[in-house]
C-alpha cells in the first residue's frame, strides 16, 4: 500500500481537492495512518451495529407496549444503525479502494446518504429532549403527547434531515491520478466557507442551542420541584400550629376545625401562587432516571461533535491545516462515528428502571375539596410530609369523635329524663 491522496473521512471536510486562493490543495496520507484509520472505522462499525442491535433485542423481548421514552430509544438505535451501515461502512469501502468506482449518480447518492444519517441522528436526539421537556415542564400537556404524536414528530425530524441533506446532491467526480474522487462541488473559496458554515450550524450549533434550552428548563423545573417540597413541609408545620390549639367548647369545635382547614388551605394556595410546582407531588424517580439517560446522550453528542467541528472550521480558514493529516486530526475526525457507538451502552447502563412502564401518573393537586377531603389528605400524608405531626391530627380526630359521642349521650339522657 503506497502513499496516496484520498478523500477525508467525513464528506463535510473537503480536503481532497480544497480550493484556497484559487489554488488546489491535495492532502497527503501515509500508508500506516490509512491502515490505522480503516481499522478504527471497522471497530466503530461493529460496536455500533452490535450495541444498538442488543438494545433493540432487549426492547423486543418486552411483551408490553413501549412507552414514549422506549419508543424514542428505538428510533435512536435505528438511526445509529443506519449511521453504521450508510456512513461508516461506505467510508471504509472508499478508503480501501482509494478511488470512487461508481458514476456521477452513485457519487451523489453516496454524498447524500452519508450526511443524511448524521442529520437524522441529531434531529431524533432533539425529539427525545423535547419529549422529556414536555413530560417534566408541562405535565398536563404530556398526557396528550401520545405514541402517535411521537411517530409524527420523529417522521418530521427525519424529513427535515433529508431536506438539509439536499445540498449534498451537488457532487462531482474529480479525475485524479488515473482514478476518480467523489466530492461536493465547491469550485471557489467562498463556496467552501458557506458549505462549512451550513454544516456547522445545521448539524451542531442549532441542535446544541435547542438541547441547552430544553435541559436548562428541565433542570430549573426539577430544582423548583425540590424547593416546592420544602415549602410544602414548612406550610404543613404552620398548619400544625392551628391544629394544636385546644378545643375549649363543644359548640365551637366544628367551627374551629373549619377555620383550621381554611387557614391551612389559604397558606398552601398562597405558596402555590408563588411557586406553581409546589402544589405538585414532585418529579418521580423514573423521570429523574430518564433525565439522566438523555442528559448522558446529549453530553456524548457534545463531546464527540465539538472537536470535529472545531477542526472543520479551522480547516476552512487555514490552508496549511487543511492539507495536514496527522494522527490527532484523524482521531478527531472519527469522533462523530463514535457517538453512534456510545449511545446503546448508555441505554443499557440506565436500563434498571427506564424499561419499566410508569404505573401511575402525577397530577397537580387542586384545593377545591371539602373539609373532610382535606382531613383525609392530611392524614394520608402523615408518613411522608409531616412526620410526627400525624399524632396531633389523630388526637384531634379522636377528640372530635369524643365530643360527638358526648353530645349524643347528653341528648339521650335529656330525652329519657322524666322532667
From Swiss-Prot:
SUPFAM superfamilies for this protein: Family A G protein-coupled receptor-like
Cystine pairs: 107-182
Membrane topology, from the record: Multi-pass membrane protein
InterPro entries: GPCR_Rhodpsn, GPCR_Rhodpsn_7TM, Vasoprsn_rcpt
Known tissue expression: Present in the nervous system and peripheral tissues.
TM region positions: 38-58, 81-101, 109-129, 154-174, 193-213, 293-313, 330-350
A Pfam family that the UniProt record links to this protein: 7tm_1
Any one annotated GO CC term: plasma membrane
Coiled coil: none
Functional note: Acts as a receptor for octopressin.
Record PANTHER family: G-PROTEIN COUPLED RECEPTORS FAMILY 1 PROFILE DOMAIN-CONTAINING PROTEIN, NEUROPEPTIDE RECEPTOR-RELATED G-PROTEIN COUPLED RECEPTOR
Name of this protein: Octopressin receptor
The species this protein was found in: Octopus vulgaris (Common octopus)
Gene this protein is translated from: OPR
Amino acid at each position: 500500500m503506497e502513499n496516496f491522496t484520498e478523500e477525508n473521512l467525513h464528506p463535510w471536510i473537503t480536503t481532497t481537492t480544497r480550493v484556497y486562493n484559487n489554488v488546489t490543495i491535495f492532502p497527503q496520507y501515509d500508508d500506516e495512518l490509512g491502515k490505522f484509520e480503516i481499522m478504527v472505522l471497522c471497530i466503530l462499525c461493529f460496536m455500533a451495529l452490535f450495541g444498538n442491535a442488543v438494545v433493540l433485542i432487549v426492547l423486543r423481548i418486552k411483551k408490553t407496549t413501549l412507552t414514549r421514552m422506549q419508543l424514542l430509544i428505538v428510533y435512536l438505535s435505528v438511526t445509529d444503525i443506519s449511521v453504521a451501515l450508510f456512513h461508516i461502512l461506505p467510508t471504509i469501502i472508499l478508503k480501501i479502494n482509494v478511488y470512487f468506482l461508481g458514476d456521477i449518480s452513485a457519487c451523489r447518492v453516496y454524498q447524500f446518504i452519508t450526511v443524511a444519517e448524521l442529520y437524522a441522528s441529531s434531529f431524533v436526539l432533539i425529539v427525545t429532549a423535547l419529549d422529556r421537556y414536555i413530560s417534566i415542564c408541562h405535565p398536563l400537556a404530556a398526557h396528550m403527547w401520545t405514541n402517535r404524536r411521537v411517530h409524527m414528530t420523529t417522521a418530521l425530524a427525519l424529513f427535515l434531515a433529508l431536506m438539509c441533506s439536499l445540498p449534498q446532491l451537488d457532487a462531482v467526480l474529480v479525475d485524479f491520478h488515473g482514478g476518480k474522487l467523489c466530492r461536493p462541488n465547491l469550485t471557489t473559496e467562498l463556496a467552501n466557507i458557506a458549505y462549512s458554515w451550513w454544516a456547522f450550524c445545521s448539524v451542531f450549533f442549532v441542535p446544541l442551542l435547542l438541547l441547552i434550552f430544553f435541559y436548562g428548563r428541565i433542570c430549573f423545573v426539577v430544582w423548583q420541584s425540590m424547593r416546592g417540597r420544602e415549602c410544602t413541609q414548612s406550610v404543613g408545620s404552620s398548619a400544625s400550629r392551628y391544629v394544636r390549639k385546644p378545643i375549649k367548647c363543644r359548640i365551637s369545635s366544628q367551627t374551629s376545625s373549619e377555620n383550621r382547614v381554611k387557614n391551612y388551605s389559604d397558606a398552601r394556595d398562597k405558596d402555590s401562587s408563588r411557586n406553581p410546582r409546589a402544589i405538585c407531588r414532585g418529579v418521580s424517580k423514573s423521570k429523574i432516571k430518564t433525565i439522566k439517560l438523555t442528559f448522558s446522550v446529549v453530553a456524548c453528542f457534545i463531546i464527540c461533535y465539538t472537536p470535529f467541528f472545531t477542526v472543520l472550521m479551522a480547516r476552512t480558514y487555514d490552508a496549511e491545516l487543511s492539507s495536514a493529516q496527522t494522527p490527532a486530526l484523524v482521531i478527531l475526525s472519527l469522533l462523530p462515528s463514535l457517538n453512534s457507538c456510545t449511545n446503546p451502552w448508555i441505554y443499557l447502563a440506565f436500563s434498571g428502571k427506564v424499561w419499566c412502564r410508569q404505573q401511575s401518573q402525577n397530577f397537580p393537586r387542586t384545593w377545591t375539596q371539602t373539609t373532610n377531603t382535606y382531613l383525609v389528605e392530611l392524614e394520608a400524608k402523615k408518613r411522608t410530609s409531616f412526620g410526627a405531626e400525624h399524632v396531633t391530627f389523630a388526637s384531634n380526630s379522636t377528640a372530635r369523635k369524643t365530643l360527638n359521642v358526648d353530645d349524643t349521650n347528653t341528648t339521650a339522657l335529656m330525652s329519657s329524663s322524666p322532667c
